[in-house]
UniProtKB/Swiss-Prot annotation:
Name of the protein in its database record: Probable histone H2A.6
Provenance organism: Oryza sativa subsp. japonica
Cellular-component GO terms for this entry: nucleosome; nucleus
GO-annotated molecular function: DNA binding; protein heterodimerization activity; structural constituent of chromatin
Record bears the keyword Transmembrane helix: no
Upper lineage: Eukaryota, Viridiplantae, Streptophyta, Embryophyta, Tracheophyta
Length: 156
């Protein structure tokens, strides 16, 4: 230990040099390579009192999961918008994306999306039968001729 003038120990530089340039702070989101805010999610986890203590990896993991889900929904919604020849994603496109995807549909089954509407769905029982439709057309035409009133038959 170095003892300076007056008998006091000289302070040693710990961490960085005393006169050196200060490094620019790097956020945890940048370190993890994420777009979602790791620090904010960590703060929400602590404030929400979900547990007495929150580990350092928990907000990073949660931010990564949320970012992945958001990217997945946005990609599918963008595809739905393109299918409808639109350049802007609207709530309807988000709903179509979620409900048409099996896993996302199961995850968000109880979620209502405002202005999303519903999936187009007609019960097959209510649809007209195609085979019977073709067979009925000639029969209807012959019935129409036979069902004409006597006055109309006399005119033709």
């Amino acid at each position: 230990m170095d003892v300076g003038v007056g008998g006091k120990a000289a302070k040693k530089a710990v961490g960085r040099k005393l006169g050196g340039p200060k490094k620019k702070p790097v956020s945890r989101s940048v370190k993890a390579g994420l777009q979602f805010p790791v620090g904010r999610i960590g703060r929400y986890l602590k404030k929400g009192r979900y547990a007495q203590r929150v580990g350092t990896g928990a907000p990073v993991y949660l931010a990564a999961v949320l970012e992945y889900l958001a990217a997945e929904v946005l990609e599918l919604a963008g595809n739905a918008a393109r299918d409808n020849k639109k350049n802007r994603i609207i709530p309807r496109h988000v709903l179509l994306a979620i409900r048409n995807d099996e896993e996302l549909g199961k995850l968000l089954a109880g979620v209502t999306i405002a202005h999303g509407g519903v999936l187009p769905n007609i019960n097959p029982v209510l649809l007209p039968k195609k085979t019977a439709e073709k067979a009925d057309k000639p029969a209807k035409a012959s019935k129409d001729k036979a069902a004409k009133s006597p006055k109309k038959q006399a005119r033709s």
